């Protein structure tokens, strides 16, 4: 039987030797694929798709059928936890995620209940079990969650935001309430990731999409501290499950992030991979960091930029190729194939 620990992805995460650089893509199950759009249409809306284990399994497997990827990522959404807390998640056409019951005052934070994760989010774990059963046995499955800070941003703002005025006002004027909210979320995220691991995921990733809007000190206090808490708890219970942290626009804080005990850091395209490796490569693996916009260009440009990312990381293991953020819906599927082929062709020279 194939030992999953021998997969390229898990070996690279643990900084063990590999024959070539592994690759997967953030949002690899998504709207750029015509087969995904068909299933989403059948589901009625995005949330129905997330909450139907059979359909979530199908869209998770779609990119694996089309491309030679080195891992699958569970199809879900980062806002499942706030939804389970009773905030009433819905997706407004053209506006992204919204909540019918956002946290409008400190009283709402004090009365917010930590949900029973195994029951309230059973559809996520059912999907994970089904995916693990149906997907190729030699490929790892990645589970994920939003970071407490990122979830809090959506919960206080009521959805996406351009300026994060409400949540920033909260951390400056109501520190105690902000920490109470973040702690409730850290407890929930930890339980959520543990249930995903029990359901069969082989690595987990924490997406801190909005950590980059904070000052350095506030990042430490209101985002990193809670991710650290989660990593420590996960490592206590599941020391062999790799944990990846990703703060968008967080390249200036890699050293702090590497101190959490995580196994890898995702880096976006604004961060130089060579200098990131010099700074933290002795402690963690690095994942990234092709600019997603490159996938809207030409074959030659894609191959050239893939080559630049691989050269920037340089020789040896500890690199997982990915985009610097999620793939966009307007990417031609054939351009994804060009990127993957380029990684397969160019990367072996860095692993001789």
From Swiss-Prot:
Transmembrane segments: none annotated. Keywords: Cytoplasm, Decarboxylase, Lyase, Porphyrin biosynthesis. Its main location: cytoplasm. It catalyses: uroporphyrinogen III + 4 H(+) = coproporphyrinogen III + 4 CO2. It comes from the Bacteria. One of its GO terms (cellular component) is cytosol. Pfam families: URO-D (PF01208). The record marks 77 as: Transition state stabilizer. GO terms for biological process: protoporphyrinogen IX biosynthetic process from glutamate. Substrate binds at residues 27-31, 77, 154, 209, 325. Pathway: Porphyrin-containing compound metabolism; protoporphyrin-IX biosynthesis; coproporphyrinogen-III from 5-aminolevulinate: step 4/4. GO terms for molecular function: uroporphyrinogen decarboxylase activity. CDD domains: URO-D. The keyword Cytoplasm applies. It is found in: Cytoplasm. Its EC number is 4.1.1.37. The keyword Cytoplasm applies. Homodimer. Catalyzes the decarboxylation of four acetate groups of uroporphyrinogen-III to yield coproporphyrinogen-III. NCBIfam families: hemE. Belongs to the uroporphyrinogen decarboxylase family. This is Uroporphyrinogen decarboxylase. It comes from Legionella pneumophila subsp. pneumophila (strain Philadelphia 1 / ATCC 33152 / DSM 7513).
């Amino acid at each position: 039987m194939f030992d999953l620990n021998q997969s390229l992805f898990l070996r690279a995460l643990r900084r063990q030797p590999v024959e070539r650089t592994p690759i997967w893509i953030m949002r690899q199950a998504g709207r750029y694929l015509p087969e995904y759009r068909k299933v989403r249409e059948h589901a009625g809306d995005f949330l129905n798709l997330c909450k139907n284990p059979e359909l979530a399994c199908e869209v998770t497997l779609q990119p694996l059928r089309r491309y030679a990827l080195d891992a699958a990522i569970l199809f879900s959404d980062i806002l499942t936890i706030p939804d389970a807390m009773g905030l009433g998640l819905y997706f407004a056409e053209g506006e992204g995620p919204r909540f019918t019951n956002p946290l409008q005052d400190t009283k709402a934070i004090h009365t917010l209940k930590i949900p029973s994760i195994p029951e309230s989010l059973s559809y996520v774990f059912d999907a994970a079990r089904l995916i693990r059963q149906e997907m190729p046995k030699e490929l790892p499955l990645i589970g994920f969650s939003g970071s407490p800070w990122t979830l809090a941003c959506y919960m206080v703002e009521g959805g996406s935001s351009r300026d994060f005025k409400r949540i920033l006002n909260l951390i400056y004027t109501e520190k105690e309430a902000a920490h109470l909210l973040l702690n409730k979320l850290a407890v929930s995220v930890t339980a959520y990731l543990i249930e995903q691991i029990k359901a069969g995921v082989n690595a987990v990733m924490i997406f801190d999409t909005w950590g980059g809007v904070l000052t350095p000190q506030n990042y430490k206090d209101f985002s990193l501290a809670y991710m650290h808490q989660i990593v420590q708890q996960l490592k206590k219970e599941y020391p062999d499950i790799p944990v990846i942290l990703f703060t968008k626009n967080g390249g200036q804080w890699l050293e702090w992030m590497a101190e959490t005990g995580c196994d890898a850091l995702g880096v976006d395209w604004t961060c130089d991979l060579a200098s990131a490796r010099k700074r933290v490569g002795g402690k963690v693996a690095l994942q990234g960091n092709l600019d997603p916009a490159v996938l809207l260009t030409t074959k030659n440009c894609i191959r050239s930029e893939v080559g630049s990312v691989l050269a920037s990381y340089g020789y040896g293991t500890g690199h997982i190729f990915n985009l610097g953020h999620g793939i966009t819906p307007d990417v031609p599927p054939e351009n994804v194939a060009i990127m993957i082929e380029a990684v397969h062709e160019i990367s072996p020279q860095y692993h001789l």
